[in-house]
């Protein structure tokens, strides 16, 4: 899709990013809201002169310093340096990772950066995944602006506490597996899961946990096999070493993390990397040394099932979440959470047609990197390559993602996404229905959508203009246009101005920075 709204925003991230606040090197981040984040006043964004196209992000170059003030260095890694940065418009603080383009020495390096941007855009909005705020490219560097994880690494917090219970370990694991269940249901394999890639949003006792560093992550389709050996030695699954693997490799890595959480040492250890790999391939896990004799049988059962050398016999993320040990404190659900795409479809169903048309316009303005993940999901569901998804294809596609729905629920979702009511979901309808609602926080997207309706550039959307737009998209459902206008028209002048339009678009959307996220407690 085109770049008509792409405002030098999107983003990218890279392998081995510097770790904020604890000197490490992962795609650190998580927005430490220095002030409460309320929506800024709705006013059309100023027109900006576009620069030349950047070779890495493939869109106009832009100076990150026009929107952010860069501060102290937070960390340094192989590919980049991370600085604290402050958004000029709001005063909010973020992390800005700068990648020198001279370090991207070949086509593969550039593709890795682009893919990471696409994946982070695809996952942005999930509560326990670091959020990408934007990416900028100038002559010398690519700059990634993301949430600031000021709380440091998860394991550092555990070590500082000095002790924790199996119940606390189960709570941590539940959050980590829920994150990966979301990734897998959205067609992403992380491929580099390790303790260093889980950061805390803040230094608060109950700070949310954030998954970071998607530099090695890939999009995948069910049944797809990967062959390249990537990851960190202690956490690599045996099938990765054998160059034939899929999403099951992530579960192995989390199983290694659980083993370490329970006993303090990795299950496969040696003096050299090759020695570690040989130990992994042998598959022998020690459950006899201290403290394993006093660890509960249920915990050991889960570790064994996550570290099964046969990926076909290994538990899936959904099965891990249903294991008795993880559910012991009663907080874990009986079934995995609905996958993110299904939740978005449900939300889309509740929107009025005016808002749905606006979302179609915004979907057409998103950059390729913002919708790449959804594009792949659409292609995966469109099994006959017709360019549309039928009811049966939607049913099968949701089932492959691990979502169990009744026939009625599938039909309801079909009706929600099929905006023009022709019995199938086309590409534009799918993107509009499933793109994350945080796209509505971007002023340039909202303004472009408003301009689409405001044909005469009067600054208002009239009854005639709204009727024309609904007809254009085949979405005039018989409701009186004046009734729709009256729902949105705050000052009762019979037309809709930009501020009223923005209020309608944001009404009923989830808070992009909810205070109540999944919380951790170390007891």
UniProtKB/Swiss-Prot annotation:
Residue span, EF-hand domain: 369-404, 405-440, 441-476, 480-511
Q: Could you tell me what reaction this enzyme catalyses?
A: L-seryl-[protein] + ATP = O-phospho-L-seryl-[protein] + ADP + H(+); L-threonyl-[protein] + ATP = O-phospho-L-threonyl-[protein] + ADP + H(+)
Source species, domain of life: Eukaryota
Q: List the disulfide bonds.
A: none
Q: Where do the annotations place Ca(2+) 2 binding?
A: 418, 420, 422, 424, 429
Q: Any idea what job this protein has?
A: May play a role in signal transduction pathways that involve calcium as a second messenger.
| Protein name stated in the entry | Calcium-dependent protein kinase 34
Quick one: which gene encodes this? CPK34
């Amino acid at each position: 899709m085109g770049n008509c709204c792409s405002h030098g925003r999107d983003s990218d991230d890279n392998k081995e990013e510097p770790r904020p606040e604890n000197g490490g090197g992962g795609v650190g981040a998580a927005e430490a809201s220095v002030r409460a984040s309320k929506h800024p006043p709705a006013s059309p964004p100023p027109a900006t002169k576009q620069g030349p196209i950047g070779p890495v992000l493939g869109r106009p170059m832009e100076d990150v310093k026009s929107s952010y003030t860069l501060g102290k260095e937070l960390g340094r890694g192989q590919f980049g340096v991370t600085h604290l940065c402050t958004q000029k418009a709001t005063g909010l603080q973020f992390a800005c990772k700068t990648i020198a383009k001279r370090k991207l020495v070949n086509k593969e390096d550039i593709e890795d950066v682009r893919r990471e941007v696409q994946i982070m855009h695809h996952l942005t909005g999930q509560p326990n995944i670091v959020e990408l705020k934007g990416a900028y490219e100038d002559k010398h560097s690519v700059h990634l602006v993301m949430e600031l994880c000021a709380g440091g690494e998860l394991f550092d917090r555990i070590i500082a506490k000095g002790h924790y219970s199996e119940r606390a370990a189960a709570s941590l694991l539940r959050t980590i597996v829920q994150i990966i269940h979301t990734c897998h249901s959205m067609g992403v394999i992380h491929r580099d899961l390790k303790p260093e890639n889980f950061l805390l949003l803040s230094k608060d006792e109950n700070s949310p946990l954030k998954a970071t560093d998607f530099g090695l992550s890939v999009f995948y389709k069910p049944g797809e096999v990967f062959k390249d050996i990537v990851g960190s030695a202690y956490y690599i699954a045996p099938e990765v070493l054998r160059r034939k693997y899929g999403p099951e490799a992530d579960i192995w890595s989390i199983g290694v993390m659980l083993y370490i959480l329970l006993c303090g040492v990795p299950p496969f250890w040696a003096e050299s990397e090759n020695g570690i790999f040989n130990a992994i391939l042998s598959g022998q896990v020690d459950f006899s040394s201290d403290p394993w004799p006093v660890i509960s049988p249920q915990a050991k059962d889960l570790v064994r099932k996550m570290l099964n050398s046969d990926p076909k016999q290994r538990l899936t993320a959904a099965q891990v979440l249903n294991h008795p040990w993880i559910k012991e404190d009663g907080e874990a659900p009986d079934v995995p959470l609905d996958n993110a795409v299904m939740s978005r479809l449900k939300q889309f169903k509740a929107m009025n047609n005016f808002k749905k048309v606006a979302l179609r316009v915004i979907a057409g303005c998103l950059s390729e990197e913002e919708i790449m993940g959804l594009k792949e999901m659409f292609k995966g569901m469109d099994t006959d390559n017709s360019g549309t998804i039928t009811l049966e294809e939607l049913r099968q596609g949701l089932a492959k993602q691990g979502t169990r729905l009744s026939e009625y629920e599938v039909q309801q979702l079909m009706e929600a996404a099929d905006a023009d009511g022709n019995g199938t979901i086309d590409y534009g309808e799918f993107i509009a229905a499933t793109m994350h609602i945080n796209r509505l926080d971007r002023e340039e997207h909202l303004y472009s959508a408003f301009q689409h309706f405001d044909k005469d550039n009067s600054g208002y959307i009239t009854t005639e203009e709204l009727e024309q737009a609904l007809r254009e998209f085949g979405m005039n459902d018989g409701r009186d246009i004046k009734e729709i206008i009256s729902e949105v028209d705050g000052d009762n002048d019979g037309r809709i101005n930009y501020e009223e339009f923005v209020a309608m678009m944001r009404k009923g959307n989830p808070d992009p920075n909810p205070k109540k996220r999944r919380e951790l407690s170390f007891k």
